[in-house]
């Protein structure tokens, strides 16, 4: 074993010479590094301290720490920028929401104001309507008594005036008169043009000469537009009323019977086949409506009036909705004169022809008038379909009245207007429809009828006074009111006030006289007439021209001058 001298080991672990003292430098410990542990006593010398870490170990760690801090600062800046952006975004969103909220609040305020305004207007309308309803109820309550008199039971058989107006004199009353007349009556044509209805000149030789000089003034043309030839348009002219049916009648038996009868008399003018299209029966009232296939066949059926059906005579009439003026444009309105009525036991011009709504009653005939004279008077307006002068069975003398039906039903109202009220000797004619109210003048006939009434009234007055009817201060209105209306005190008061208000429109009205029926039933002169006395002729002339032809409670007014001396003496039947 070699002998060596034992030396203490003070190396740096490299097996080399000990490092010089300058090779060690004091580096501060990195921030955050744990404090150096206390030196552990060893057998070595303390040449190596905590400051004796190598330079190679310290420098890289310090560089990484700087970069980490820079990255952290960059991240912090990025986060700050993100926070700023988020804050700006929230501010913008908050601003948008605030603006939306403001807009919504403004819209809601406007809507609330508009709704409030609408509610106020609606409340105002409701209040006004309430006031109007209250006023109407007051008027209805006030007028109840008068309406009661106008709406009496139909069983009394009277046509009541239906003028709804308040009894309260403070409110505006509704007059019984219609609207004011036209400014002037249309000028009359010099000659009868196509479509005009000429006046038939009377040809009463030696009895009433030149009484109706109407040939020089033809009527205003009646313009009738032809309707479309459809089933619905012609239905009113194709229907036939059949009354007085036996209880055993039904739709089938009526249809079969009329088909056979129409074929037997030669009335099927529309060709082969059945003439009846439909039958409707009212078993309670024992009548039927028979619908024919053509207007001409319906007119031919009119000749069957009075025919025997199952042992009972039946009435064949036009229905109430039949309009002769319109039907004239659709086909013949009269039966074919060549019908073979004898084949079914009928004769032309039999008593059956004197039935129906167009039958005329002629009363007030002088007893010494013969049948030929009365017929001559009536036929001055057209040929007659039927005529019957009623005579006493024992003596054979005339009873002073007759019935007739014209072949042309359109002249029915014309003849009534022209003949009614004419003085014949010591008698005054009463000429009207036998079934008064069953058939009123159609609207298409009113202008023609108005002119006829004007001419007739003028001729009647001229005939009565023996010369021209000079204007007077007194105007007489006829066909205005009925005796039944005059019996009721309230109704009478309303009529007087209506006449006074209407008369004052034309000038200085002095007096209104409306004769009333006697409660005991004794005859009173002038009942049904209204007399208006004016201060001057100018006012009375205006009133006559303005009120003539007007409607008062659905009655057509006839206005004429009345003699002042008779009015002053209280003679109201002139």
Curated annotation (Swiss-Prot):
Spans of biased composition, class Basic and acidic residues?
53-143
What name goes with this protein?
Answer: Splicing factor U2af large subunit A
Which residue ranges have biased composition labelled Basic residues? 144-172
Major site of localization recorded for this protein:
nucleus
- SMART domains in the cross-refs: RRM (SM00360), RRM_1 (SM00361)
* Start and end residues of each stretch annotated as Disordered: 1-180
- Keyword RNA-binding attributed: yes
SUPFAM superfamilies in the record? RNA-binding domain, RBD (SSF54928)
Q: Which domain of life is it from?
A: Eukaryota
Q: What is known of its domains?
A: N-terminal RS domain has a very strong bias in favor of D over S.
Please describe what this protein does. Answer: Necessary for the splicing of pre-mRNA.
The family note in this entry says:
Belongs to the splicing factor SR family.
Please report the organism this UniProt entry assigns to the protein. Answer: Oryza sativa subsp. japonica (Rice)
For this UniProt record, the keywords arranged alphabetically read as follows: mRNA processing, mRNA splicing, Nucleus, Repeat, RNA-binding
Q: Which residues form the RRM domain?
A: 238-321, 358-436, 479-565
Compositional bias per record (Low complexity), positions renumbered to this chain: 18-41
| GO term, biological process aspect, one | spliceosomal complex assembly
Q: Which GO terms describe its cellular component?
A: commitment complex; nuclear speck; U2-type prespliceosome; U2AF complex
């Amino acid at each position: 074993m070699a002998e060596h001298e034992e030396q203490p080991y003070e190396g740096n672990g490299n097996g080399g010479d000990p490092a010089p003292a300058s090779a060690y430098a004091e580096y501060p410990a990195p921030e955050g590094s744990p404090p150096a542990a206390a030196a552990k006593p060893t057998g070595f010398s303390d040449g190596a301290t905590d400051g004796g870490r190598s330079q190679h170990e310290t420098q890289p760690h310090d560089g990484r720490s700087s970069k980490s801090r820079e990255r952290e600062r960059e991240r912090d800046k990025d986060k700050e920028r993100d926070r700023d952006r988020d804050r700006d975004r929230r501010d913008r969103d908050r601003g948008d929401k605030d603006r939306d909220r403001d807009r919504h609040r403004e819209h809601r305020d406007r809507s609330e104001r508009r709704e409030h305004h609408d509610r106020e207007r609606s409340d105002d309308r409701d209040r006004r309507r309430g006031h109007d309803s209250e006023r109407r109820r007051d008027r209805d309550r006030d007028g109840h008594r008068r309406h009661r008199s106008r709406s009496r039971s139909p069983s009394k058989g009277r046509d009541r005036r239906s003028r709804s107006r308040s009894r309260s004199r403070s409110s505006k009353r509704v007059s019984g008169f219609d609207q004011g007349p036209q400014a002037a009556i249309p000028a009359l044509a010099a000659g009868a043009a196509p479509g005009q209805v000429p006046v038939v000149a009377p040809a009463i030789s030696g009895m009433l000469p030149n009484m109706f000089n109407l040939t020089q003034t033809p009527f205003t043309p009646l313009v009738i537009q032809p309707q479309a030839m459809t089933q619905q348009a012609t239905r009113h002219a194709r229907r036939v009323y059949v009354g007085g049916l036996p209880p055993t009648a039904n739709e089938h038996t009526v249809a079969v019977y009329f088909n056979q009868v129409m074929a037997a008399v030669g009335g099927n003018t529309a060709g082969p086949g059945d003439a009846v299209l439909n039958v409707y029966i009212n078993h309670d009232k024992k009548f039927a409506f028979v619908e024919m296939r053509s207007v001409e066949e319906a007119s031919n059926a009119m000749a069957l009036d009075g025919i025997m059906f199952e042992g009972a005579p039946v009435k064949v009439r036009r229905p109430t909705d039949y309009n002769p003026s319109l039907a004239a444009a659709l086909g013949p309105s009269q039966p074919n004169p060549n019908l073979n009525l004898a084949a079914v036991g009928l004769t032309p011009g039999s008593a059956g022809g004197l039935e129906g709504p167009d039958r005329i009653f002629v009363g007030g005939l002088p007893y010494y008038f013969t049948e030929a004279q009365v017929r001559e008077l009536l036929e001055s307006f057209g040929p007659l379909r039927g005529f019957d002068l009623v005579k006493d069975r024992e003596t054979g003398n005339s009873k002073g009245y007759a019935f007739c039906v014209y072949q042309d039903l359109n002249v029915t109202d014309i003849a009534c207007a022209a003949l009614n009220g004419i003085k014949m000797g010591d008698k005054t004619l009463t000429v009207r429809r036998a079934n008064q109210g069953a058939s009123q003048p159609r609207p298409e006939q009113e202008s023609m009828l108005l002119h006829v009434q004007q001419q007739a009234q003028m001729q009647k007055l001229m005939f009565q006074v023996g010369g021209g009817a000079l204007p007077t201060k007194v105007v007489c209105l006829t066909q205005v009111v009925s005796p039944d209306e005059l019996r009721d005190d309230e109704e009478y008061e309303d009529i007087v006030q209506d006449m006074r208000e209407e008369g004052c429109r034309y000038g200085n009205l002095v007096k209104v006289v409306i004769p009333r029926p006697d409660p005991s039933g004794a005859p009173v002169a002038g009942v049904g007439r209204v007399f208006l006395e004016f201060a001057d002729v100018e006012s009375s002339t205006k009133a006559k021209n303005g009120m003539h032809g007007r409607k008062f409670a659905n009655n057509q007014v006839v206005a004429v001058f009345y003699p002042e001396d008779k009015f002053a003496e209280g003679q109201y039947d002139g």
